[in-house]
Amino acid sequence: MAFHMATRYAHSPEDIKHFDTTKLRQEFLMEKIFNAGDILLTYTYNDRMIFGGVVPTESSLEIKLSKELGVDFFLQRRELGVINIGGPGSIIVDGDKAAMVKQDGYYIGMGTKQVVFASDNPANPAKFYVVSTPAHKTYPNKKLPFANALAKPMGDQQHLNKRTIYKYIDASQMATCQLQMGYTVLEPGSSWNTMPAHTHARRMETYMYFDFAEPDTRVLHLLGEPTETRHIALFNEQAVVNPSWSIHCGVGTTNYAFIWAMCGENQTYDDMDQVPMNELR
């Protein structure tokens, strides 16, 4: 088992005006999220979110972070959200085991001492996408089946953005310290997500793109200030960090899905500032 946690630092809007393609990708793109038998994480200084992939195969896996976070165990002062995008597996949370099929989620509160990830079949391993944010209070652990996710249809075919937003961890459904998490699925024939664009200065957000309709599907993710945008070309199962001052939207060559996760000082999902189309540059 390999464990690796990369670090991404925070940037001001002025910084990326001078980034070339290579530098932009180095600072905001996570090219490898899932690798069989490994735990691959990224720590971003944007609201101190940790995110990444856990892919157990023959053996179960456990995230063990202590010195890196100045704590005795990983979730001593953090909460954790999980969504499985792979084969069937399970999570053991302080001794309580829960089956996790594809699209199932889980919320794990501060103070949980042990979280163990396992796959039912090593040849078709579970792929657990995990997101952790700082916490100040313990909220109950809760399995989040896909069937219970709050579905919100958005967009239309005329604007190439017909999609459904599935809210797993959302303040309207459950209490957390700051974590919000869910995923969005675009319908065939649609390619745009989160367009018209918006910003939310009180929260940062990560996008992890996956379930591309075709092997050669690519997504161009847009970020930056509305009047100073940049793009990053993404492959399947890659993630991008969006600072709170940045737009975050994308367009694909076919349809796709992405997991979004947010944290910051405001949990109101609709607390956002819409960007008029004529202001985009």
Curated annotation (Swiss-Prot):
Catalytic activity: 5-dehydro-4-deoxy-D-glucuronate = 3-deoxy-D-glycero-2,5-hexodiulosonate
Enzyme class: isomerase
GO annotation, biological process: D-galacturonate catabolic process; D-glucuronate catabolic process; pectin catabolic process
Superkingdom of source: Bacteria
Family designation: Belongs to the KduI family.
PANTHER family in UniProt: 4-DEOXY-L-THREO-5-HEXOSULOSE-URONATE KETOL-ISOMERASE (PTHR38461:SF1)
Primary role: Catalyzes the isomerization of 5-dehydro-4-deoxy-D-glucuronate to 3-deoxy-D-glycero-2,5-hexodiulosonate.
Name assigned to this protein: 4-deoxy-L-threo-5-hexosulose-uronate ketol-isomerase
Origin organism lineage: Bacteria, Bacillati, Bacillota, Bacilli, Lactobacillales
Underlying gene: kduI
